[in-house]
Structures are given as C-alpha cells and as structure tokens.
Amino acid sequence: MVSGCCRLDMSSYVSVLVLCSLLLWGSNSQQEQSSAAQRCFCQVTGYLDDCTCDVETIDHFNNYGLFPKLQQLVASDYFRYYKANLKKPCPFWEDNSHCGVKDCAVKPCPTDEVPGLKPPGFKYTEEANRAHEEIDDCEKEKRLSAVDESLSVEAQEAMLKWNRHDDSADNFCELDDEESPDAEYVDLLKNPERYTGYKGADTWRIWNSIYEENCFKPKAVQRPLNPLTSTRGENEGKVFYNWLDGLCVEKRAFYRLISGLHASINIHLCANYLLKDTWMDKIWGHNTAEFQKRFDATLTQGEGPKRLKNLYFIYLIELRAISKVLPFFERSSFLLYTGNETKDTETKKLLLDVLLDARDFPLHFDENSLFSGDKKEAAKLKEDFRQHFRNISKIMDCVGCFKCRLWGKLQTQGLGTALKILFSERQIENLSESNQPSEFHLTRQEIVALFNAFARISTSVKELENFRTLLEKV
C-alpha cells in the first residue's frame, strides 16, 4: 500500500514535472515571441542614476517640444557650416585604416578635378556643382564616407564675411585647427551622420582607447563586452559596475557621458542605415536588427539598456549647459552673423526660443553636485576631467572614416563646450550688455558644435521612439 502510494506520488510528480516543463517552455516561447521592444526598452524607464529626472519626462519634453525646433535651428545658414581639419594625422598610432574599409577606397580624380590646379574658386562655381550633369568616373566612385566639401559661391563669400565678424569679437579661445590651411568649411546638411561601412577592428580600437585610457579605469577592471579582450569572465559586468558605483560622482559622470555619446552615435547609424545599394539608387532607413544587436538586453548580456540610459544622462548634461548659457545669447549685442540681416534676426529668435524651452525644463541635472568637495582636490579633479576629455578629442583624428571623423570631432567639441559652460557659471553671471571683453566667450565654432551636438543627442532620443514602434512589430 505504501509502495502503491509511492508509485502514485512518483507518477504525480512526473506529471507535475512534465506540466511544469510545458508551462516553462510556453513561458520561454512566449518570451521569445514577445515584442523585441520589451527586450530593448523595458529597463529604459524611471529615474536615472545621480539625477532627479526620469526617462519619461525627457521623452515627452524632447519629442513633442524641443526636437522639431532644434532641427529647424541647425538647418539654418549659421549652424549648418562647420570648419574641420580632416587631414590631421593620428597623434597616437600610425593609422591607415581608411584605406582598407569597404566602400572607402580613395581613387585618383582626373587632373582637371584636382583642387588648386584650377582657380581656387572653381569648385564653388555652378559648373562644378551640377550634380546631375556630366558625372565623371571619380564622382561615380565617391565613397560612402567621403565628405562633400563643395560650397556655393555665395556660401564661400559669406564665410569670409563671417570670419571677419568673428575676428572683430573678443575670442575666449582659438582652436589651432581653424587656422590650419587644411581646415575647411563643411556643409553638415550635405554630410549627414549615417552608416558608412566603417566597422570592425578599426572602430574597436578607437573606442577601446577612449574607454580604457581616458575614463579613469584601471586595467585590472574589464569593460563588459569589450571585443578586444581575449578572455571574458562571467562576472566581468558585475565587477565593472561594482567598480563604477564606487567612483566619485564626477568620474562616474565622465564614463556615462562617453557611454551616452557612444550610444547616440550607434543609434544614428542604425536609424540611417544603407538598406539597399544599387547602381540606380541608395535607400537609407531604420535597421532594427542592427539596433537589437547593440541594445537588446538578451543579445548584449544586459548592457544595451544601460547604454540607452546613459544616452538620457548626456541629454540632461547638454540640456543643462544650454539652459545656463542663455545670458550669453540673449544680449542685444550678440549677433548670429551671416550677412543676411532678416534671416539672422529670425535665427536668433528661434535660438532664444530653444534656450527658453531648455531653461523651463522642470528636472534639470544639478551640476553643483560636481566638484563640490575640498577646493584643492576639486580643482585637480576638474583639470584631470578636462585633460581626459582633450585626449578623447585628439583620438578623433585617428578615425579612419572621414565622415565619421567629421561628426566625431563636432560632437566631442559640442560636449566639451557644454562642459566649459557648466564650469563657467560665475563668468556667465558676470556678463554685461557692453562689448567690453569678458571672462566668458564662445567662438562661432563652439556655438555651431554645441547646438549641432545637442541636436544629435535629441535626434537619438526621438529615434528611440521610432525604434520602439518598429520593434513592437518584430
């Protein structure tokens, strides 16, 4: 009888096991069939670390308020031209990576197309810019990563006037790069940030140098999912975040800024991916598979959602900087000079509208939490902070894809300008309406970089909404 009971219990036990297995299989199957959006975004919600702001507040503020205004602003003449030297050699290692990247091969142009052999203004003429007429073989072979440096005659002449106007102002700082004969103005609207085919070991080397050498991290602590690490431990993520949580808020913020910038760049590449490339046309659009590879919690061992939350962190930092710099731009003596008085007035009105919106954001990052300890230690930490960021900006000259290099330079300078603003509160408060030299000044280059960089971050936040909708169908 006891034996029979045991057999009955064992039979019931087996039945329960089978039933549980079926339920578990069904649960896993249901999880696999659940929206891919949940795996990417379910953890990207609520409050951000070291902040009093939540993701949902940023989404609503950006997507339905600030984003469209920023897009209109950076499309204006003042903000669409950025001066960059894309020919500087990498200062850290010998770099020939751009020669080996697919679709980035440099082919010689016919002699009559080489700049300098014809009058300097030739490439800005109507003849040289007829996009749909006699296109030579060199043009047909234009690389995805090539930077379109052509400017109209009107734009070229306007640049000279803009420079003269800037030279008459009291420049707070002058970048050596702008004075280089290799520095050229680039039309950002002609060179959108998007997928170029630049990937693999070369890009890993860039980001590895940024994270490993400039984010205050000891070599003993392994960064999760580092593709250049030969051996990976199961607990590397836990060890890394235990180390990160133990840092002072300033160093932790530095890492999260770089991670957020990295995430933003990846989002742009996924949102503007080359989906179809034929001899007839190129089709660009959202690549959900690429997005999942970078941000799906399952595919990234939980890293993806952390990266996305860091995007919101850098958004808060740059938004705070823009709100703080309002006194600089609202002075009547400040002009967004392009030579077209009517458009310049309209652009400044739009700029002030953006700045006022930024000021009225309800849950700003509190920059007073940074560098608030012992004055001597805080000063040293701030200088370390600045030097590390300068190193990162230099690494941009090692990027093998010229279009990637362009946007890397712009976005690092934009973030650097935002940090400069946050560290200059007293100087900004002491600004006056007069044209007398002041301790705080932004050059045209810094202004263009600041707002274009923030527009890129704003676009990334908006694109998350688009990807969330697309992934709900996957």
Swiss-Prot record:
GO (cellular component) term, any one: endoplasmic reticulum membrane
Pfam family of the protein (one): ERO1
Binding site for FAD: R194, T196, W207, S259, H262, R294, R307
Gene Ontology terms for molecular function: FAD binding; protein-disulfide reductase activity; thiol oxidase activity
Enzyme Commission number, as recorded: 1.8.4.-
Subcellular location: Endoplasmic reticulum membrane
Top-level enzyme category: oxidoreductase
Keyword terms of this UniProt record: Disulfide bond, Electron transport, Endoplasmic reticulum, FAD, Flavoprotein, Glycoprotein, Membrane, Oxidoreductase, Redox-active center, Signal, Transport
Main subcellular location: endoplasmic reticulum
Name of the molecule in the record: ERO1-like protein alpha
Annotated source species: Xenopus tropicalis (Western clawed frog)
